[in-house]
């Protein structure tokens, strides 16, 4: 077993594992992800027999916390080939990536797990649950106006969201 961080020019080598484990993602999304998102991310892997068997991606994000910009990494694409699971690979990848983020002075990281129980042993906790609401235009309400957002609405929606979040949370 060999744990290492891939060099930028090696990132593409993890795509076949991504496609195997995240088969629900469309080919178009995977192409976008490996063309755009892996330009500036970090990919930790575990290799056996010269092949990538497990991986973890750190995608960089800038966050606003208490009016200050903070750089953080979003943990994504944590995957292990089925026949290599239950060997502690995910734990090793998490430990190494968390150590590296700590050494780099990063105050926190985050992820959106498929199942919260997977990450509880690593002290990750749910800090936010997104509520989903569905409205149909056929059901008019005096309080709610429903219309499809256009590209022109994006700036106004972002400003509204940022104002609301700043007033209600420390972001």
Language-model features: locations:
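A conserved beta-strand-loop-helix scaffold within acyl/acetyltransferase catalytic domains
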Residues: 3-78, 163-171
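Alpha-helical elements of Rossmann-like donor-binding domains used by nucleotide-donor carbohydrate transfer enzymes
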Residues: 13, 17, 96, 156-159
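Short coil/turn motifs at secondary-structure junctions
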Residues: 61-63, 83, 116
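Conserved acetyl-CoA-binding loop-helix of GNAT-fold acetyltransferases
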Residues: 75-101
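Long alpha-helical, hydrophobic tracts
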Residues: 90, 97-103, 115, 151-152, ...
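Short active-site oxyanion
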Residues: 98, 103-109, 145
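Conserved active-site alpha-helix within GNAT-family acetyltransferase domains
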Residues: 103-107, 113-131
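Amide-forming acyltransferase catalytic core, primarily the GNAT-like/NAT-type
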Residues: 126-171
């Amino acid at each position: 077993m060999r744990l290492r961080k891939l060099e930028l020019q090696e990132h593409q080598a993890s795509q076949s594992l991504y496609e195997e484990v995240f088969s629900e993602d469309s080919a178009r999304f995977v192409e976008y992800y490996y063309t755009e998102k892996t330009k500036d991310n970090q990919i930790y892997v575990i290799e056996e027999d010269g092949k990538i068997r497990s991986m973890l991606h750190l995608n960089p994000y800038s966050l606003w916390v208490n009016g200050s910009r903070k750089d953080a990494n979003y943990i994504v694409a944590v995957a292990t080939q089925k026949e290599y699971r239950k060997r502690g690979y995910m734990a090793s990848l998490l430990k190494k990536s968390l150590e590296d983020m700590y050494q780099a002075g990063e105050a926190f990281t985050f992820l959106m797990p498929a199942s919260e129980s997977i990450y509880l042993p690593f002290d990750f906790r749910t800090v936010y649950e997104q509520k989903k609401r569905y409205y149909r235009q056929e059901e008019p309400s005096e309080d709610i106006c429903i219309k499809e957002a256009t590209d022109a609405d994006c700036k106004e929606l972002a400003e509204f969201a940022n104002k609301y979040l700043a007033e209600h949370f420390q972001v």
